[in-house]
Amino acid sequence: PMIIEASINESVSKDVNPHIPYGPEEGAEVGIACAQAGAAIVHYHARDPITGENEWERGLETYLECYRLIRRECPDVLVYPTQRGYTLDKAPHLFALAASEEGLELATVDVFPQGGFSSNDSSVMITLMEELQRHRVPYSIGVREIGHMRHVARYRELGLVGDTLVLKIFWNETSVGPTPGMRGLQMYLDEVPPGVTCQW
């Protein structure tokens, strides 16, 4: 089956697209419309309602209000926030959302390797996944290069990737990763660890 995820604003400004939602009410309006059109997942960046500035980890109340409004109309849709990775001080909103009455149904972990892997790896991505597991929050893993799949294999060895992997493959117009297309996609899928079912 196809699962549709709607990323409704990211960091795009209204100057580029006047329909881009900023604050929680606008985010909810667009999120509800996407859910009613068939999206199963809504990804929303908390943004200042006037300036559109990303609130990132400071946007807990914005996230909560947007998600309450979406779930009131579309209780079956999954909604989840952004997180910048790099350091855990950029992810406190994830754990606050997980502990809130609204809860956190999904998170995303992008591969931003720091210093490679060793037997005692303490990279922030591993710590983040361990914390998400402790809070019982499922997560997808985002990759931008074929080499990132080697990290996914290591996460599997460490028990951070289960038998089912939700993989986000980022394509863009820059010269990062393989050329977008079926051949490039297959290059990623060929590197999925043995015994793992991959949803992408």
Describe each model-derived feature in a short phrase.
Residues 8-12, 46-50, 83-87, 111-115, ...:
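Active-site-proximal loop/turn and secondary-structure-junction residues that shape catalytic pockets
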Residues 27, 34, 45, 107, ...:
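Conserved, mostly hydrophobic/aromatic
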